[in-house]
Amino acid sequence: MTQENEIKRPIQDLEHEPIKPLDNSEKGSKVSQALETVTTTAEKVQRQPVIAHLIRATERFNDRLGNQFGAAITYFSFLSMIPILMVSFAAGGFVLASHPMLLQDIFDKILQNISDPTLAATLKNTINTAVQQRTTVGLVGLAVALYSGINWMGNLREAIRAQSRDVWERSPQDQEKFWVKYLRDFISLIGLLIALIVTLSITSVAGSAQQMIISALHLNSIEWLKPTWRLIGLAISIFANYLLFFWIFWRLPRHRPRKKALIRGTFLAAIGFEVIKIVMTYTLPSLMKSPSGAAFGSVLGLMAFFYFFARLTLFCAAWIATAEYKDDPRMPGKTQP
């Protein structure tokens, strides 16, 4: 080997330190420390009263089949719309029977706007049937509506009680006689209808009064007041929702909930219900623009409304039932008396 080809190795000290081999134990310790930090932070967050309460309510809602009960309530709610439509059909028949000129105007509009003679004749026959059989349809619709309404109320009551009682299984005290159960559900249905009428009346009267005040004081042209009026209308609607849910959570559970939990849970339900109404208000018009939406949009929208209403009601019932207080014997570290 010649001198030129001989490998020359450096004899001076290197200016940098050689790369050390990666220590797997050090890497594992860093990962474990990061995981421990994340776990500790998550535990601290879960120990916060609001988050802990939300977790308890969610666990109870899921463990006690909240989604399944919500789907069942949706089904019975949609099924109960059929007798209501029958009653509405009969009411329209009574109105048309007492106003022959209005009936003739409807026939004229049908002939003007529908070019197909067969379809026009079918619609005229349907309207004539509604007028002629209004009494029969109305009585049958009322009877079926009463029966389905009582059963709907019973299903809603059982679903809320499943979320409200301390244990999942029904106790012997929960068993009621057949006629007592139906009488109780009938009274509850009447109470719910009264509460619904009161809340709708409050919303309607408040909205009309607001419009009268705006028109009387000539406030329409003041732009900065428009958001204020919207907020006032929103507050009135939430208050009406609050009255409705307060009656539901106060009347339907077997045992009366604590006042603080009832007030807060009802407020949560009122806000959630208002959010559902706002979302449905903006979603349905866009859904109805498509051909399929025009055909099925109203049905799907109604089912979605019932489903979200049922889930919200049951979740807030679970939220009220899982509320803990310092003097509550169910809290950790305390024993039942």
Curated annotation (Swiss-Prot):
Keyword set includes Ribonucleoprotein: no
GO CC list: plasma membrane
Ranges annotated as biased composition (Basic and acidic residues): 1-29
Annotated region (Disordered), positions in chain: 1-31
The organism's place on the tree of life at top rank: Bacteria
Parts of the chain that traverse the membrane: 75-97, 134-156, 186-208, 228-250, 262-284, 299-321
Topology versus the membrane: Multi-pass membrane protein
Name of this protein: Inner membrane protein YhjD
PANTHER family: INNER MEMBRANE PROTEIN YHJD
Biological processes per GO annotation: lipopolysaccharide transport
InterPro entries: IM_pro_YhjD, Virul_fac_BrkB
Cell compartment(s), UniProt: Cell inner membrane
UniProt cross-references to Pfam families, sorted A to Z: Virul_fac_BrkB
Record keywords: Cell inner membrane, Cell membrane, Membrane, Transmembrane, Transmembrane helix
Location, primary (coarse class): membrane
Periplasmic membrane side: 98-133, 209-227, 285-298
Keyword hit for Transmembrane: yes
Ranges in the topological domain labelled Cytoplasmic: 1-74, 157-185, 251-261, 322-337
